Regions:
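The feature represents the membrane-entry module of six-transmembrane cation channels
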Residues: 1-262
């Protein structure tokens, strides 16, 4: 049996969602299924998933993860929470939340770029700690996108087009960055592609660190212990990593084709 922390209120929506799915009756499944399918069809008709998660919901997810799974990475969260909770409906987590919990989600206003190997609690703390963002709704891959898509139809072309169109439509990208000495996103091909898409479509890009990282970064800059120009010079898409080597090759090809002179 799972032992739940006393620091996690039972009213936490991510705890509640997990509990309600585990106790779901056939009648509830029959009631929820057509509603979820309607939301999924709307995403498909739109061509791109644009649902965002509110800052308060991000804070609730951070609290859930901090209390029960503090060592999870973003990848762990995807496979051990999202995929398990949404398995019976094969839908996005936000569409499931909207139907099962009745929490209305709005169109995203900020596209969040991050590394999948990030500690989930720390990543969510960065987003939840954003100032002047109480009215923002965040596009976060693991929550917004249906994680059950067939890879034969949702291949590189689908993902690259989705990122490009989402970034263009949403209008603002926030890149969560740490550690500052060698930020993981700047070594990942897909993250660099998202930065490129933001620049290519002339959209706003903000870089966000948590308080601890920001203090260390500012201190290193002030004391001259950090070579900013050298840091930037190391950013190289050709040397970046990707889960699939062919993705990296395709990303390089797309970027070169869109840049004048290659």
């Amino acid at each position: 049996a799972t032992t739940f922390s006393t620091h996690l209120p039972i009213s936490n929506p991510f705890f509640e969602l997990q509990y309600r799915i585990s106790k779901m009756t056939p009648a509830e499944k029959a009631e929820w299924t057509p509603q979820i399918r309607a939301l999924e069809r709307a995403d498909h008709k739109r061509g791109i998933p644009l649902t965002g998660v509110s800052k308060s919901l991000v804070s609730s997810l951070r609290d859930y993860v901090a209390a029960l799974h503090p060592t999870w990475t973003m990848t762990d969260f995807k496979f051990q929470y999202v995929v398990e909770v949404a398995a019976q409906f094969k839908c996005s987590l936000l569409n499931l939340i909207q139907v099962v919990l009745g929490i209305k989600c709005q169109q995203a206003t900020v596209f969040v770029s991050h590394a999948w190997r990030y500690n989930n609690k720390r990543f969510l703390s960065c987003v939840a700690g954003l100032k002047n963002a109480d009215k923002e709704h965040f596009w976060i891959d693991a929550l917004t996108v249906n994680q059950f898509h067939d890879t034969s139809t949702h291949d590189f072309t689908w993902w690259s087009d989705t990122f490009l169109k989402c970034i263009e439509t949403i209008g603002k990208t926030t890149l969560v960055l740490f550690p500052y000495t060698n930020p993981i996103p700047l070594t990942r091909a897909w993250c660099l592609f998202e930065i490129f898409c933001t620049h290519h479509k002339n959209r706003d890009l903000d870089i966000v660190m948590d308080d601890r990282e920001s203090r260390s970064f500012r201190s290193a800059l002030a004391t001259g212990d950090f070579d900013f120009n050298g840091w930037v010079a190391k950013i190289d898409l050709a040397n970046a990593e990707a889960w699939k080597e062919e993705d990296k090759a395709n990303i390089l090809s797309v970027v070169k084709s869109k840049l004048k002179g290659g």
